[in-house]
A protein has these predicted regions:
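Conserved ABC transporter NBD signature motif
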Residues: 57-68
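Conserved ABC ATPase "signature" region
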Residues: 110-127, 179, 185
Length: 282
């Protein structure tokens, strides 16, 4: 189990990024972290990985305390893997060589089998002999994920893992990756702006605002009852509708056009969304 206990961190006294964060995550569970840019998502992942010296609080994985650079010559926990947005790949060797980099050379057959398995997960078999410098940003992102999984981690930390990947590839890659992690019982934390990472694949969702945890619950519960417009807006367009004396939040699909109503609206635009039209009215 991962236990994050009342941690705070700032890059300076005047720039506190994480304010008293507390949550737990069971082994094998998947957590998504959402929030506006600059709210602390990436910083939280770095803190959990052990790249930062906390101002206060502590982090435990099972019986082991996660300690920062002050306590390690090489920061970062050995049984965690962290995939940042800059990938940190080796550009002049092939895709398969990047994946094999941290696998044992004493067991070449096992290393090759593991590499082929991960190439299937990231849908990159056709590029196994391609040098990384010749790949697109999205392809590099997929290789970085595979390399992180090569020596099977207990906890995988992913920072915007599908941000540079083509839309037509995202869905199948998500399904492959998260199914693989569940099958291997690998705990995963994903920092993301994309609601699809959370709604379809996460066991828990944390929303951050103003450097604090605003909500922490199952994604379905947060989506159905978002409490604040800021939270609802992470998933979809949202309307504040007055019902009686109360103001309630409603997604577009929860509003219907009827022949007779106490409320009138004038359509000012419409947007084709493939399976439906989004109507803008005032």
């Amino acid at each position: 189990m991962l236990v994050v206990n009342n941690i705070s961190f700032g890059y300076s006294k005047n720039k506190i990024v994480l304010k008293k964060f507390s949550f737990t995550l069971k082994e094998g569970e998947h957590l998504c972290v959402m929030g506006e840019s600059g709210c602390g998502k990436s910083t939280l992942l770095k803190a959990i990985y052990g790249l930062l010296n906390l101002n206060s609080g502590n982090i435990f994985w099972k019986e082991n305390e996660v300690l920062g650079p002050k306590f390690h010559l090489v920061p970062g926990m050995n049984f965690f893997k962290y995939v940042a947005q800059d990938f940190d790949l080796m550009p002049y060797i092939s895709v398969s060589e990047n994946i094999k980099k941290f696998l044992s050379r004493f067991y070449p057959e096992e290393s090759e089998k593991r590499t082929q398995e991960l190439l299937e997960v990231i849908e990159m078999k056709a590029f196994e002999n391609t040098k990384v410098k010749n790949l697109s940003g999205g392809q590099k992102q997929r290789v970085a994920i595979a390399r992180a999984l090569a020596k099977e981690p207990e906890l995988l930390l992913l920072d915007e893992p599908f941000g540079q990947i083509d839309n037509f590839k995202k869905n199948s890659l998500r399904r492959n990756l998260f199914a693989y992690l569940k099958n291997k019982n690998i705990t995963c934390i994903v920092a993301t702006h994309d609601k699809n990472d959370a709604l379809s694949f996460a066991d828990k969702l944390i929303v951050i605002r103003n450097n604090k945890i605003l909500v922490n619950n199952h994604p379905l519960e947060i989506y159905k009852d978002p409490k604040e417009k800021y939270v609802a807006a992470l998933f979809d367009d949202v309307n504040e509708v007055t019902v009686g004396r109360q103001s309630v939040l409603r997604y577009p699909h929860q509003i219907k056009i009827v022949e007779k109503s106490e409320k009138n609206a004038t359509v000012i635009n419409s947007y084709f969304k493939g399976s439906y039209w989004l109507i803008e009215a005032e």
